[in-house]
């Protein structure tokens, strides 16, 4: 918004020329996100606490989580406010990359909000806290993925084919369908990525500061990719495809990183608030959407490695348990689980690792994977 209001005045006020630089607007978005978090955070937390919007502690979680039942949840509202306010202020709102990323984040945030709200309502009514019915939640995520995939296929936002993606470590390698009809497979591909990443971040959100820190690392990395791919000179030097307009996603990424760090101020152990599904689904949607828009879905194997491992641990745990339950009986299946507890972070807690140790070590792994992802720009 400020770009369109002040940039035309740059001839008279030279200071406004700074708005032409994505780096300046990204830095401004980051700082604004922090300020919004610090200003609105305490008020939102007080309101959530007054409304008794408390975290639901699931059965079977480590004993150290027993005291978290009084911690307010739905703190993802802080993240959403701290993301959208700076994006609306500092980004070029005519840019389709930014608009699509915002739309996906908002859509997933609404799904998460409904889930958190229904859990609260069911708790007050003395019912089982299941939240939004799983199939309805999945349907909402799938619908979002179908919409994004169809839009990108029918209205490409770059010079690259709509149904295409790139591969890390390869120069100018574009993966496209071999036949025309196969282009429609791009829609379920986008749906799979978006749904998978949003649920992966949701599964990871089980320890104080874990998912917010990992998302900040992942989105910061994707933001650097957006800046590189959005510049003619840098993309040519690194021999990657140029995506006109993609650089504006750097501003969006900076806002998300600032929102995550601002939220981490309140979510660090011992947490004053949890993001709930409102935050985790929204952040997962943002990560997935950015990777899809940058034609860099396979990059998620690096920047989202921890999220991927958490998801695999849950799938493996459930699959093996069901198999052993059917073949050997419940007693054997319960005694011979693959992990002591899934997702993976709970497994390490059950092994005796303190919560903060698990979080910091997972952050370290996330940083190392981010460095590996950045190395793909040069190792081609």
Swiss-Prot record:
Q: Which reaction does this chain catalyze?
A: UDP-N-acetyl-alpha-D-muramoyl-L-alanyl-gamma-D-glutamyl-meso-2,6-diaminopimeloyl-D-alanyl-D-alanine + di-trans,octa-cis-undecaprenyl phosphate = di-trans,octa-cis-undecaprenyl diphospho-N-acetyl-alpha-D-muramoyl-L-alanyl-D-glutamyl-meso-2,6-diaminopimeloyl-D-alanyl-D-alanine + UMP
Q: How does it sit in the membrane?
A: Multi-pass membrane protein
GO cellular component, as recorded: plasma membrane
Does this UniProt record's set of keywords contain Cell inner membrane? yes
Q: What is this protein called?
A: Phospho-N-acetylmuramoyl-pentapeptide-transferase
State one Pfam family annotation.
Answer: Glycos_transf_4
Tell me the name of the encoding gene. mraY
What GO biological process, any one, is recorded here?
A: cell division
Pathway in which the depicted protein is active: Cell wall biogenesis; peptidoglycan biosynthesis
UniProt entry keywords in alphabetical sequence: Cell cycle, Cell division, Cell inner membrane, Cell membrane, Cell shape, Cell wall biogenesis/degradation, Magnesium, Membrane, Metal-binding, Peptidoglycan synthesis, Transferase, Transmembrane, Transmembrane helix
Organism equals Gemmatimonas aurantiaca (strain DSM 14586 / JCM 11422 / NBRC 100505 / T-27)
Q: Tell me which EC number(s) this protein carries.
A: 2.7.8.13
> Where are its TM segments located?
25-45, 70-90, 98-118, 142-162, 173-193, 209-229, 245-265, 272-294, 357-377
Similarity annotation: Belongs to the glycosyltransferase 4 family. MraY subfamily.
Subcellular localization is given as: Cell inner membrane
Cofactor(s) for this UniProt protein: Mg(2+)
Give the EC class as a word: transferase
Cell inner membrane as a keyword of this entry, yes or no, is: yes
Q: What does this protein do?
A: Catalyzes the initial step of the lipid cycle reactions in the biosynthesis of the cell wall peptidoglycan: transfers peptidoglycan precursor phospho-MurNAc-pentapeptide from UDP-MurNAc-pentapeptide onto the lipid carrier undecaprenyl phosphate, yielding undecaprenyl-pyrophosphoryl-MurNAc-pentapeptide, known as lipid I.
**Any GO MF annotation of the entry:** phospho-N-acetylmuramoyl-pentapeptide-transferase activity
Major location (coarse):
membrane
